[in-house]
Regions:
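Conserved ATP-binding/catalytic motifs of P-loop helicase motor domains
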Residues: 1-158
Length: 158
């Protein structure tokens, strides 16, 4: 249903840019989809994932929180999309161990972290503005050896 609704002109521009990015050989440059609340980022994300799916890519979606992952799962189901890997938190995908250090949670890499993205061609990271620099650094390092394409979706106001 949602994949048949028309796109706004801005969404069309983003979809064209995504297709061009997807058609180029992966060079480690991520695709960034940025927009304010209510601008249709999630709606457009489903279209972009349908394009990746049609290209035969192994893909999944992640978010920093379980609540955001739940929202993504609902939208994927409504769009009739089935990711290669079950949607999860970014921490789970990267096989990170969470530990408390003083009053903060810290991510600790495990023996499985380095190869976490080995079989994925594309990962869409929703709520990307909530990903801290340490987690981003781990994600980029894990994606690099496998040329896993990263799509960051976020709100510039957050």
């Amino acid at each position: 249903l949602t994949l048949t609704l028309p796109l706004t002109p801005d969404q069309q521009d983003a979809a064209v840019a995504f297709s061009a990015w997807l058609d180029r050989p992966g060079d480690g440059t991520p695709f960034v989809l940025s927009g304010y609340a209510g601008s249709g980022k999630t709606f457009l994300s489903m279209r972009l994932l349908a394009r990746a799916d049609a290209a035969g890519l192994c893909w999944t979606v992640v978010a920093p929180t379980h609540k955001a992952v739940g929202v993504l799962r609902q939208h994927l189901q409504l769009a009739g999309l089935q990711p290669t890997w079950f949607p999860s938190t970014l921490h789970r995908l990267l096989r990170l161990k969470l530990r408390r250090e003083r009053d903060q949670e810290c991510c600790e890499e495990t023996a499985l972290t380095a190869a976490a993205l080995e079989h994925l061609a594309l990962v869409l990271i929703d709520e990307a503005s909530m990903v801290d620099s340490a987690l981003l650094e781990i994600l980029l390092r894990c994606a690099h050896p496998y040329r896993t394409r990263l799509v960051f979706v976020g709100d510039p106001a957050q």
